[in-house]
Amino acid sequence: MGSDGTSAATAEAAIVPGQAREVWKNTILAGLANYIDAGSIVAGSAALALWASAYGLSTSFIGLLGAFSANAISAGVGALIGGRLCDRFGRKRIYQYDMLFYAFGMMWLVFATAPWMIVVGFVLVGLAVGADIPASWSLIAEQAPTGKRGKHSGVAQVLWYLGPVVVMVMFFVLAPLGLLGARIVFAHLAILALALTLLRSRMKESERWTQAQEEAKRARLAGEASAAISPWRELMRPKHLKSMAFLIGMYGMWNLWAGTNGFFFPYILSTVGNQTQAVSVGVQALNFGLGIVSIIFIFMKFADRVNQRLLFAISALMQVVAMALLAVFPLTLPVALLHVVLGGIAVGFGAQSFFQLWSSELFPTRIRSTAQGVTFAVVRFGLGIWSFFVPALTATGFHTLAWILTGFLAASGLIGIIWAPRNEGKSLEEIEAERSATA
């Protein structure tokens, strides 16, 4: 990347303790998008049974909510639009003001009194969280020091899992309040989004993005041929298409499992497994809590230092075994707990964490957020289409659905094991130089 890479590498080498604290603070502020995204998904899932009972929602309508929620199509559209805007106007503009839009959407869920209001709220919230993901993930990768990018990405993933834990604990406490308790949970997410808007206003723009813009401007003034290539045309180059195909395959297959498990698991437990609402959300909270422990003590500790492909393979195998338990055995609370413990540990250093890391590493700064937005959008679109049919599949036999989800995890694992990159310990500039040399 020429001067961009040189200056960025110099800046990394010059980081002092005070600056390091600032970088970590920015990582947390950017990563809170993950808290809000995952918290929104799980809050909606935990409220699903309550809404179904209060409004007499049909199986088809429940599928519609899943398809257009923050977990699927709406988030995909938001990521597609937000990713391109991030590369064009900067990361800060998107991640600062996007949370206001999120709060507006969440208020529809807080005050929803009819099914159509729930749909509107889900769509608006999904658009907002989708737009924020490329902005926050790009910023985290671009400001992280070389050799610590996985650790900084891990912080965002901890927040991704912390959101559901907080939401689930709140549902435990507020369960006697029924729908009022759900409204309180949604309100806490809206308030956090407003606070995050204020805190993010003090953050600086990504230095790498600023340098990339300056370099592009110099190239245009010099009449260089590379300056005439549009970002979309650049994204369509074979090496980038291959990277997107890998990411979509690996994360897309995994997300079909995760999206179904995350959005419908409490619903499945309370209907098919005949567990109470409190027990179902408690089991899910345990899953996310184990994920946090796994991220901190496995992913953040080893992702920058060991063979990432091997780390991914171990996680993939554990998740396949965990999901197969639900396919083979009757859906009882002990089986669900074993599934949660084994799978919860595995997901912390698996596809979700590596998707954030690899999607930030495999594309140059000029198109990084755009590429992340495209891959994220395709994955969420696929999940949205799939989610529409999950309630009907569950009604015809949960074990059939469990076998299908086991197959998704196996496919994701194979794709990751075969094509995973080896970027541990490298700077973004080193990765780009290597990819340019082999293109």
Residue ranges: model-predicted function:
Residues 1-42:
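Cytosolic juxtamembrane N-terminal segment immediately preceding the first transmembrane helix
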Residues 45-77:
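Extracellular/periplasmic helix-loop-helix junction of adjacent transmembrane segments
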Residues 90, 111-116, 329-331:
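Helix-breaking motifs and short loop linkers at transmembrane-helix boundaries and internal kinks
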Residues 121-158:
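Cytoplasmic helix-loop-helix junction between adjacent transmembrane helices
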